[in-house]
Amino acid sequence: MKKTDIILIAVVAVIIVLGIVFLGKSEAKVEYDYPFTLKGEAGLVELTYSEYEEKIESNEPFIFIIERTTCSHCQNFMPVAEKFAREYNIPIYYIDTDKFEGDEWTGLEKSNSFFKKNSGNWGTPTIMILVGSDAVDYYQGETDSDGLYDFLSEKISLSTNS
């Protein structure tokens, strides 16, 4: 065998081994039955950090918004979210990060799959569909009622008050 053939075989073997190692470490994707039916009173519900942790631990699906009262995009979006929640009879939970104390930021950044994948690379408002610590889907930025409907309608059971 030529030296180049041996090198080629070694390179292919290394690629195969690395592929097996990395594929074996990939997270198992959880499959969900959509649409989710949400529990709770319709409307916008502010959570403290400890209440957010309780929602995560419940493993029930919920819509979660991260916002800041000092964020102009949040100021525009939150009234849209409130009207949407009432119109479609769903609870939408949110947390105001301007009210965080101590290590609540650190806790939030470790609390679900979205933050683990996007560490430090996100802004407000961010809307997530969470089941436990699994961020099933998310939308970053301000949107209108139609955009919110487009984001939520495939995964959340929506019915109007009419």
PLM regions with names:
Residues M1-A42, S162:
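N-terminal targeting signals for export/organelle localization
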Residues G43-E46, I66, I90-K110:
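Thiol-based oxidoreductase modules, predominantly thioredoxin-like and allied folds used
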Residues L44, T69-N76, S119, Q140:
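Extracytoplasmic/periplasmic, Sec-exported soluble proteins
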Residues E51-Y94:
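Local sequence-structure signature of Cys/Sec-based thiol-disulfide redox active-site neighborhoods
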Residues T69-H73, D98-G102, D134-V136, S145:
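Solvent-exposed loop/turn segments at secondary-structure junctions
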Residues N76-F77, G107, D144:
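Residues at alpha-helix caps and immediate loop-helix transition turns in enzyme cores, especially N-
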Residues E109-W122:
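Short, solvent-exposed, Trp/other aromatic-anchored flexible loops in extracytoplasmic proteins
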Residues G120-S162:
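Non-catalytic, surface beta->alpha helical segment in thiol-disulfide oxidoreductase systems
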